[in-house]
Amino acid sequence: MARNSVLLLLLSLVASAPASAQLLVGRERSPPDLSGEWRLESDEDPGQPPLGDYLGIPYNDAGRQRSDTTAESIWGTSEYRCRPHSAPHQWRGLGGARILKELDPLTRDVNAYHVQFWRSLDRPIYLDGRPHPPAYAPHSWTGFSTGEWVGNTLVVTTTHLKDGFLKRGGPQTSDMYTMTEYLTRNDDYLTVVTIVDDPIYMDEPYVQSTTYEYDPNTIVQMESCVTSALGEAGGTDPHFVPHFLPGQNPYLTEWLGEQDWIPEAATRGGAQTQYPEYVLASPSGTRRAALPLSRSALDVGRMIAAQSPRDGEVHVLPVQGNIYMLVADGTNITASVGPDGVLLVNTGTAVMVDKVRAAVDALATEVAAAPRPNPCAGANCAGNAHGWASPAMNAIVASPAPARPIRYIINTSAAPEHTGGNAKLAVEGFFARRGGTNVTGAAANASVIAHENALATMSAPPGDAAPLPPEAWPTDTYFYDFQKLSEYVNGEAVIVYHAPAANTDGDSIVFFRHSEVISAGNLLSTVSYPFIDIDIDGGGSVQGVIDGLNHILDLAVAEYRSQGGTWIIPSHGRLADTADVASYRNMITMIRDRVRQMIDDGMTLEQVIAARPTLDFDGRYGSTQGEWTTDMFVEAVYESLARR
């Protein structure tokens, strides 16, 4: 049990430290200083093994298929090209590491360490006791890290990580993994033990270690980057997704002909390949873990659900600029709040409308009507009408005005979870028409905007479904590819784009051009496969969903190192950026291509479902129960492709 032995030895050394050393009371007994320039000395695993070599990685079947089918060149596509190395690989990439201290200006305590690598963002490790963000907060390449001293070892816990790779040679991670690091300094040597716990792709945690040597002459350079990579990513197609169909990757075993030091069976990885007894026994006779030993594998469903909490409450997450994300019992609502009032993208379910209204009122009061005190005090304050200012006068002059009402509601589709609050919120809103409210018969409700096809579904739904009440219907519709709102709202242009034949025939996305935020509607969900209405009246298709996601990627721009920048709010789940949307697009594209190949091979729907073309993604997005199951998604993909 080699890797577990490393962990047990480490923990035993920590536990055996004297109590006084563990308490670290007093500045004279403070923890060791980790700051400085560190040169990579050695690590137990090569940074880039041959493609298909997963020896020692505790992969399950889903992780193995994900790695087999993902082409390494995918990291050269425009959405990923400038990303830093994934968190598990950063300690083992080229170059050394620079660790900087952030000190409290009064106590001189270390509030945080900042770690920098050759190809990385600045990675803070907070030591000030702050909590980790909620599950619906965005993920990043470096994640969110907090540290705590245990003896002379800094134990770092990192969450909110994007999907990436364990090693550059193909082994993949999901975006649900956590990483625990043990950083121990002994004189001029820094030992880093990392434990990756991925409940989607691994049966057990994956342990690695690395050694650095202190070297003040080491230079940690920053790698330059440009995002253009069309030659690598499919010629002139900017949306090309490099991947292999299951069983058709020709590069997984070609290296074994020259490097025959390892049996092919061992290259497939798995929990059993971590242990010494695997080397001594026939691969066919080795054990497999009876139960998942990953600390989070048994809770993965709860971890995913936490990205879209269904607790009957409304949670508010500031996004960027004027924009906020309201998580309303599992459904996301986008709110633009400012001096012009409130613009909502979708209104949630009918049962949540009162709590949504209360949350919107609170936001409008806090953001749009908040007092703006004069920071100057005294008789000579410039710009003050009274010639002087004081806290008391500020309170009088800048007392809160009433919150501005809801002016606009934009529905990205006719789905009940997006239109359930339309009737009540629109009636309580205000949008002056025809010169004001004194015109007889002119309604002053909020303006409700949607695509014409969404109005048709709300007013005359197919089958036996009841129509929405007329007061919930859109008051303004558009027919073309997009519609610009006729004036700025809260200081920015708002553009509504049609996503034809996507989830339905009436889907829209909404782009807030100054805040750099896109509300994606049902095109994006970080907790499920996309819903696709393939009925004749529904008009949805898998290709339309992919096209809609590609449109979002065309509009969005990453801020730096392939993350941040334009934020994308999904219909359900956590806040996303361009790399997250690309990962979701890639997943759907890979599944589409697999199902299309099966159709070309003459397989029936039942045979395709039994073949599990979604195997490597089911643990992350699949479901066997509820309103939208994995089988229903596969059927929608199959039928939308078979009809073309």
Q: Which stretches of residues belong to each language-model region?
A:
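Metal-dependent catalytic neighborhoods of phosphoester/phosphodiester hydrolases
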Residues: 419-429, 581, 617-619
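PEST-like low-complexity, intrinsically disordered acidic/proline/serine-rich tracts
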Residues: 22-294, 323, 395-400, 434-441, ...
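Conserved beta-strand hairpin/beta-sheet module of binuclear metal-dependent hydrolase folds
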Residues: 315-387, 508-522
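Accessory terminal helices/loops
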Residues: 291-304, 434, 558-565, 574-644
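Metallo-beta-lactamase
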Residues: 341-343, 348-351, 369-391, 398, 404-418, 436-500, 504-506, 513-514, 548-556, ...
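Bacterial N-terminal signal peptides
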Residues: 5-16
